[in-house]
From Swiss-Prot:
<keyword id="KW-0520">NAD</keyword>
<dbReference type="Pfam" id="PF02540">
    <property type="entry name" value="NAD_synthase"/>
</dbReference>
<dbReference type="GO" id="GO:0004359">
    <property type="term" value="F:glutaminase activity"/>
</dbReference>
<feature type="binding site">
    <location>
        <position position="173"/>
    </location>
    <ligand>
        <name>deamido-NAD(+)</name>
    </ligand>
</feature>
<keyword id="KW-0547">Nucleotide-binding</keyword>
<feature type="binding site">
    <location>
        <position position="165"/>
    </location>
    <ligand>
        <name>Mg(2+)</name>
    </ligand>
</feature>
<feature type="binding site">
    <location>
        <position position="140"/>
    </location>
    <ligand>
        <name>deamido-NAD(+)</name>
    </ligand>
</feature>
<comment type="pathway">
    <text>Cofactor biosynthesis; NAD(+) biosynthesis; NAD(+) from deamido-NAD(+) (ammonia route): step 1/1.</text>
</comment>
<dbReference type="InterPro" id="IPR022926">
    <property type="entry name" value="NH(3)-dep_NAD(+)_synth"/>
</dbReference>
<feature type="binding site">
    <location>
        <position position="189"/>
    </location>
    <ligand>
        <name>ATP</name>
    </ligand>
</feature>
<keyword id="KW-0436">Ligase</keyword>
<dbReference type="GO" id="GO:0005737">
    <property type="term" value="C:cytoplasm"/>
</dbReference>
<comment type="subunit">
    <text>Homodimer.</text>
</comment>
<comment type="similarity">
    <text>Belongs to the NAD synthetase family.</text>
</comment>
<dbReference type="GO" id="GO:0008795">
    <property type="term" value="F:NAD+ synthase activity"/>
</dbReference>
<keyword id="KW-0460">Magnesium</keyword>
<feature type="binding site">
    <location>
        <position position="211"/>
    </location>
    <ligand>
        <name>ATP</name>
    </ligand>
</feature>
Length: 274
């Protein structure tokens, strides 16, 4: 088995999908998790205005609405959370996403004060924090807020990780990578776009240039620029196609570098890192 084949197997990627079937599978998955854990009543998800949170949010709202209809339990709720750092430049996109999702509840938690307070504390301790590191602090603070909300509402936190992010490790460890349930896992970037099209989302939600937008000095930095490889190449690789040797090497290098993000904290019994 080649490394490409092994990665495809581990991430559960299909070369061809039926978007409607994948929507149904994700909704049923989200419903089944709450039904299996009757002490949980809500899903919580941060909404950025990009493709991934728009899709995960819509799937979550669909699952919750079906659960309420099937059980008669009005405690089932989906809570969408806006988590800007100060003023978000593309706030209009986030509002479009909320209009598409139509969440039961929408909260806004501005993380700027918490992030800046953490930076001041670190600087007082004698550390100078890089802009890149600050970006990861933002991502982790967003998850702190989401888990605080989930803790108060008997909830579980949804993550937006999908196959194209997972293979490259393009997420913050214990930040956006720290969630309870991943309804998009197995899907490539273009497959996620196909699901949004099937859900009749506004094209702006899936045609927008993907960006983590974590660094102050590189606002709106495109994912593909940061990764040095295009989502088309990543998706082709994950769907089993042949791509350029250079792109394949870069993707597989990201895979190896990001292995620690896919595991629980390393124990003496682990050998994947050796």
């Amino acid at each position: 088995m080649t490394l490409q084949e092994d990665i495809i197997r581990q991430l559960g990627v299909k070369a061809v999908i039926d978007p409607k079937q994948e929507i149904r599978q994700s909704v049923d998955f989200l419903k089944a998790y709450l039904l299996k854990h009757p002490f949980l009543k809500t899903y919580v998800l941060g909404i950025s205005g990009g493709q991934d949170s728009s899709l995960a949010g819509k799937l979550a709202q669909m699952a919750i609405e079906e659960l309420r209809a099937e059980t008669g339990d009005e405690q089932y709720q989906f809570i969408a959370v806006r988590l800007p750092y100060g003023v978000q430049a593309d706030e209009a996109d986030a509002q479009k996403a909320l209009a598409f999702i139509q969440p039961d509840q929408a909260l806004t938690v501005n993380i700027k004060e918490a992030v800046d307070g953490q930076l001041r504390a670190l600087e007082t301790a004698g550390l100078e924090i890089s802009d890149f590191n600050k970006g990861n602090i933002k991502a982790r603070q967003r998850m702190i807020s989401q888990y605080a909300i989930a803790g108060q509402t008997a909830g579980a936190v949804i993550g937006t990780d999908h196959a194209a992010e997972n293979v490259t490790g393009f997420f913050t460890k214990f930040g956006d990578g720290g969630a309870d349930i991943l309804p998009l896992f197995r899907l490539t970037k273009r497959q996620g776009k196909a699901l949004l099209k099937a859900l009749k989302a506004d094209p702006s939600l899936y045609e927008k240039v993907p960006t983590a937008d974590l660094e102050d000095k590189k606002p709106g930095l495109a994912d593909e620029v940061a990764l040095g490889v295009s989502y088309q190449e990543i998706d082709d690789y994950l769907e089993g196609h042949t791509i350029s040797a250079e792109a394949q090497a870069r993707i597989e290098d990201w895979w190896h570098k990001g292995q620690h993000k896919r595991h629980l904290p390393i124990t003496i019994f682990d050998d994947f890192w050796k």
